[in-house]
């Protein structure tokens, strides 16, 4: 209260002296603001002391830790099934969790942990493993019959030539399974103009 009266008396003295210059007026305003801020700071400090003093009687740092939790997930769309539970009393933790494996079994893990023994876990499986059946597909190779110039092989490596039909096509100079136009060594077919072939002898006779 005394500070407020002093501040009012100070302002009245300045007003009667006729000091109206902007620079001086601003300086006085800043000074009074600083004085008010200082008083506010003292109030905040006292409040802080009260909070700290009240906190000493609430916190006990020697109380043993204690908690427990449990949760589970069961998703029928994705097949995800799992659960976990854990309890801690002081420095000893005990827990268990389980989850569904892809082979149809359930893995169960029971664990304990403390300062003396460390972490120990026992893992077990429940149920019988079901392995998915593997499908074996047999490859079917179509056999080419005949074409304009020659007969393609049963999957030869000849390039496409003058209108052959088949998987191998007609090779220009022979090949592994294609018909040779200029001879060469055909793997499965007869060369048209000579060379060695495997099976298509009647084709040359038909052309001659």
Curated annotation (Swiss-Prot):
Residues 64-135 form the Chitin-binding type R&R domain. Residues 34-180 are annotated as: 2 X 10 AA repeats. Sequence repeats lie at residues 34-43, 171-180. GO terms for cellular component: extracellular matrix; extracellular space. Epidermal regions synthesizing hard cuticle. Residues 1-17 form the signal peptide. GO terms for molecular function: structural constituent of cuticle. The keyword Signal applies. Keywords: Cuticle, Repeat, Signal. Cuticular proteins play a significant role in determining the physical properties of cuticles. This is Adult-specific cuticular protein ACP-20. The gene is ACP20.
């Amino acid at each position: 209260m005394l500070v407020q009266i002093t501040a009012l008396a100070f302002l009245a003295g300045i007003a009667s002296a006729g000091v109206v210059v902007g620079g001086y007026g601003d300086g006085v305003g800043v000074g009074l603001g600083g004085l008010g801020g200082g008083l506010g700071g003292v109030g905040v400090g006292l409040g802080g002391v009260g909070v700290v003093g009240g906190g000493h009687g609430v916190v006990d740092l020697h109380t043993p830790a204690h908690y427990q939790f449990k949760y589970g997930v069961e998703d029928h769309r994705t097949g995800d099934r799992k659960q976990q539970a854990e309890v801690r009393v002081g420095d000893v933790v005990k827990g268990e969790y389980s989850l569904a494996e892809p082979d149809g079994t359930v893995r169960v893990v029971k664990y304990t942990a403390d300062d003396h023994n460390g972490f120990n876990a026992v893992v077990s499986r429940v149920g019988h493993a079901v392995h998915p059946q593997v499908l074996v597909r047999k490859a079917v190779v179509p056999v080419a019959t005949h074409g304009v110039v020659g007969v393609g092989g049963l999957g030869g490596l000849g390039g496409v030539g003058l209108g052959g039909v088949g998987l191998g096509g007609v090779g220009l100079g022979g090949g592994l399974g294609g018909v040779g136009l200029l001879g060469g060594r055909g793997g499965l077919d007869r060369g048209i103009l000579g060379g060695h072939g495997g099976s298509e002898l009647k084709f040359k006779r038909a052309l001659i």
